[in-house]
Amino acid sequence: GRGIIAALEKLKEKGAYEMYRPDVVIYDVLGDVVCGGFSMPMRGGYADQVFVLTSGENMAIHAAANIAMAVDNFKNRGYAKLGGIILNRRNVKHEEEKVRELCEDIHSRIIGDLPRSETVTDAEELAMTVLEAWPDSEMAGEYRKLAGQILAVCRKQGENNA
């Protein structure tokens, strides 16, 4: 937990947010670590929205449910809200059905649906992102579409808070 906050404080100290003026900052935390490390960006005021990426695998669904419950507990303290679920397909049986059921249980929705793609693993082998390796690929388009969906949710939340 302390390492995450130290990194965020260093970015702030260096003026990274003012210099780059990002629309969105993404913090990637392990789903099985719903503890201080997960909550620090929210408690420190570094997060307004939380988007949970999950597949339809049972352990991923379980971790996503735990994260959603933690976010729900924090929202009453004025911390971040759950922006939605992103389905990162692994092509397991009944995957979409399981994730939709999760969404019903946590009162959320799927805001993005990433297909399983060998393009991702091929890019990883090159130590690159898909957008770096193949910016015109179908998968790069999927990531751009997801970025637009995340921005739409964030902008709507911003309008509701104005």
Q: Each predicted region: which residue ranges?
A:
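Short, hydrophobic alpha-helical segments
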Residues: 147-158
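Short, hydrophobic-biased amphipathic alpha-helical segments
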Residues: 135-146
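C-terminal boundary of histidine-terminating zinc-finger modules
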Residues: 126-137
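Glycine-rich oxoanion-binding loops at beta->alpha junctions
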Residues: 2-3
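Conserved Rossmann-fold dehydrogenase catalytic segment
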Residues: 119
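Active-site donor-binding loop signature of nucleotide-sugar glycosyltransferases
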Residues: 116
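Conserved catalytic-core segment of NTP-binding enzymes
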Residues: 6, 10-24, 29-113, 122
